[in-house]
Amino acid sequence: MKKLLILLALLLLALGLTACDWADSTPDEMHGFLDDIAGYFGSSQITDDDELIGTRKLSDDAYTGTYTSDCAGNTGRDVIFGGGSILNKTLSLEGQIMTESGSAVVRIRMNDEVIELEPDSDGHFDTELNILSGGNYIMIDYSDFAGSVELHSKYTDDPEHE
C-alpha cells in the first residue's frame, strides 16, 4: 500500500510539473504521454532479461518481439511481453513448442481474462489478440519442461505502430 501511495504521489507530481505544457499538446500527444506512464507502471510485471528461462528480443515496444528457449527440465514462469496501456492494440502471436518432456503453456492475460493457447499436433500456435486498455501480458509457464519454445509477437496492420 505504501508503494502505491508513493507511485500515486509521483504521478501527481509529474502531472503537475507538466500540466503547463499540455495547453499546446495535441490529443495524440497527451494520449502518448499517459500511455507511457501506464507502460512504466505495467512494466514491473515483466520478467527481467537476466531472470528469463529463455531469451527475449524486443521490437517496437514491450508488446512485440521474439522469444526463444531451449530447456532441460525447467520449471517457472517467463512473463515475456506486455504491460499497462491506455491504448487498444491488435497483435499477431505465433510460434512453436517442441516438447520432449514436461509442459510449456503459453498464457495470455488480458486484464481479468486469462487464456491458454493450444498448439496443434506439430506444436504450432497462432492467434490474433485484440488487447483493450489495461494490463495485458504474454507469458509461458514451464513445468519440468525439456524442449524448445519459439514465440513471435507483432502488431497487425495498425497504422499507429507501422
Descriptions of predicted regions:
Residues E100-L117:
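Short, surface-exposed beta-strand/strand-loop-strand elements in extracellular ectodomains
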Residues D24-G83:
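Transition segment at domain starts
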Residues M1-L4, L11:
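Positively charged n-region of N-terminal signal peptides that target proteins for export
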Residues L15-A19:
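C-terminal motif of bacterial Sec signal peptides marking the signal peptidase cleavage site
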Residues Y142-E160:
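Edge beta-strands of jelly-roll/beta-sandwich modules across compartments, strongly enriched
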Residues G73, I80-L91, E128-S133:
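Extracellular and analogous surface-interaction loops
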Residues K89-T99, I140:
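A short beta-strand element within beta-rich, extracytoplasmic domains
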Residues G65, L132-N136:
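A glycine-anchored, Pro-Gly-centered beta-turn/N-cap motif
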